[in-house]
From Swiss-Prot:
This is Neuropilin and tolloid-like protein 2. The lineage of its organism: Eukaryota, Metazoa, Chordata, Craniata, Vertebrata. The modification Phosphoserine is found at S409. Keywords: Disulfide bond, Glycoprotein, Membrane, Phosphoprotein, Receptor, Repeat, Signal, Transmembrane, Transmembrane helix. The gene is NETO2. The chain crosses the membrane at residues 348-368. N-glycosylated. GO terms for cellular component: glutamatergic synapse; postsynaptic density; postsynaptic density membrane. Residues 296-332 form the LDL-receptor class A domain.
Length: 525
């Protein structure tokens, strides 16, 4: 009995184990069947496989019918100096329509939706072989709300570009050339490639600049300088802008003509790519990037009036960071950096040494000049003669009437004697003429004659003395009454001689240092 019960328990346990193991095996089998199958989100368009030499892609749900109201875009990119070759499988069906107005497949020669159109395809027949003229191809699949079909499956591969056969065919591997920038603003420069020697002279340029904005910000790009050596030849040189990553799907703009416009990115990561072949090394660009947030603006940001808020540190910094120059309007002109602000450490050292040398020489010169005059003054004091300086610098002392008393009295005595003799002679001559002639006309002539005689007498008297420089002149006037003779006939002109005015100018001259004086007498009637 006990053995039978034990056997029954073992059977139950065995059955339970087998059931559990069976369930586990079934679960593993189901999981194994799901390996390699990827659930495609509703927003993704089919399967796309990429390789270094090409790849393949298909319409959504291929080989089943594609969904209605679907739009998928595929952008193919080859390596530099290569083209793209596109082929389709035979299992192909897209709703046919006139000029493919409804469901269709659109292929363009380039990376954009506005690139040259190659053709539109629909119907039951697969498209022929398609080749691009450059390294990009833009493909769009579109379906409407009715009549879905099988769809398509396409393969693409990269082939050498025959336009570059003169350069040796396929391009040699280009060295890594990448740069990173971040912050509120900054400048992307193509000249950085040569400065950091990322490429060798004569080598093609294929460089990437990755820009990271400040947190929660987007990026605004503005070209400060732009020049393509071969304009409108995108195969040879271009500047491309990507929004979010360097993937071809995120290509925002591409410039290879003569003009480059501003670009607003929707994310905080921007990628700038420059391509220039060996013959386009003169191509260059310089680009300003600015981090911005959308309004409303905070206290730490500035409103640019163009749906932009930039950091306050970028206002009035001499650079236009807004799309319009609102941030640089109403700014006070900043003073230019002074001379001392521009002096570097080396300049300061040179100026300091030079100034020290000049200062030492100046001090030595001052000491020499201070000591030298003192010696000269000491030498002059020993040879100083007060008497000589007294004679040279003291003015001469003049005394009026410094004649000796004897000489003055003798001169005055001689002068008075001469005057008396002259008066007597004059009276006698006048009286005799008036008595004998009995007229007054002769008296006038006698007066004239007397004056003539007086002048003749005066000349030798004045010539006795030389004419030195006069020092002072004084006049002595003597009034004397004239004698009148009453004759039988009165003379009317005799009244002129009632008074005799005698002026005796005395002039004193000093000759040299001698105290001698001379006098001259002039008598006028």
């Amino acid at each position: 009995m006990a053995l039978e019960r034990l056997c029954s328990v073992l059977k139950v346990l065995l059955i339970t184990v087998l059931v559990v193991e069976g369930i586990a095996v079934a679960q593993k089998t189901q999981d194994g069947q799901n390996i390699g199958i990827k659930h495609i989100p509703a927003t993704q368009c089919g399967i796309w496989v990429r390789t270094s030499n090409g790849g393949h892609f298909a319409s959504p749900n291929y080989p089943d019918s594609y969904p209605p109201n679907k739009e998928c875009i595929y952008i193919l990119e080859a390596a530099p100096r290569q083209r793209i070759e596109l082929t389709f499988d035979e299992h192909y069906y897209i709703e046919p329509s006139f000029e493919c107005r409804f469901d269709h497949l659109e292929v363009r020669d380039g990376p954009f939706g506005f690139s040259p159109l190659i053709d539109r395809y629909c119907g039951v027949k697969s498209p022929p072989l398609i080749r691009s003229t450059g390294r990009f191809m833009w493909i769009k699949f579109s379906s409407d709300e009715e009549l879905e079909g099988l769809g398509f499956r396409a393969k693409y591969s990269f082939i050498p570009d025959p336009d570059f056969t003169y350069l040796g065919g396929i391009l040699n591997p280009i060295p890594d050339c990448q740069f990173e920038l971040s912050g509120a603003d900054g400048i992307v420069r193509s000249s950085q490639v040569e400065q950091e020697e990322k490429t060798k002279p004569g080598q093609a340029v294929d460089c990437i600049w990755t820009i990271k904005a400040t947190p929660k910000a987007k990026i605004y790009l503005r070209f400060l300088d732009y020049q393509m050596e071969h304009s409108n030849e995108c195969k040879r040189n271009f500047v491309a802008v990507y929004d979010g990553s360097s993937s071809i799907e995120n290509l925002k703009a591409k410039f290879c003509s003569t003009v480059a416009n501003d670009v607003m990115l929707k994310t905080g990561i921007g990628v700038i790519r420059m391509w220039a072949d060996e013959g386009s090394r003169l191509s260059r660009f310089r680009m300003l990037f600015t981090s911005f947030v959308e309004p409303p603006c905070t206290s730490s940001t500035f409103f640019c009036h163009s749906n932009m808020c930039i950091n306050n540190s970028l206002v009035c910094n001499g650079v236009q960071n807004c799309a319009y120059p609102w941030d640089e309007n109403h700014c006070k002109e900043k003073k230019k950096a002074g001379v001392f602000e521009q002096i570097t450490k080396t300049h300061g050292t040179i100026i300091g040494i030079t100034s020290g040398i000049v200062l030492v020489l100046l001090i030595i010169s001052i000491l020499v000049q201070v000591k030298q005059p003192r010696k000269k003054v000491m030498a002059c004091k020993t040879a100083f003669n007060k008497t000589g300086f007294q004679e040279v610098f003291d003015p001469p002392h003049y005394e009026l009437f410094s004649l000796r008393d004897k000489e003055i009295s003798a001169d005055l005595a001689d002068l008075s004697e001469e005057l008396d003799n002259y008066q007597k002679m004059r009276r006698s001559s006048t009286a005799s003429r008036c008595i004998h002639d009995h007229h007054c006309g002769s008296q006038a002539s006698s007066v004239k004659q007397s004056r003539t005689n007086l002048s003749s007498m005066e000349l030798p008297f004045r010539n006795d003395f030389a004419q030195p420089q006069p020092m002072k002149t004084f006049n002595s006037t003597f009034k004397k009454s004239s004698y009148t003779f009453k004759q039988g006939h009165e003379c009317p002109e005799q009244a002129l001689e009632d008074r005799v005015m005698e002026e005796i100018p005395c002039e004193i001259y000093v000759r040299g240092r001698e105290d001698s004086a001379q006098a001259s007498i002039s008598i006028d009637f």
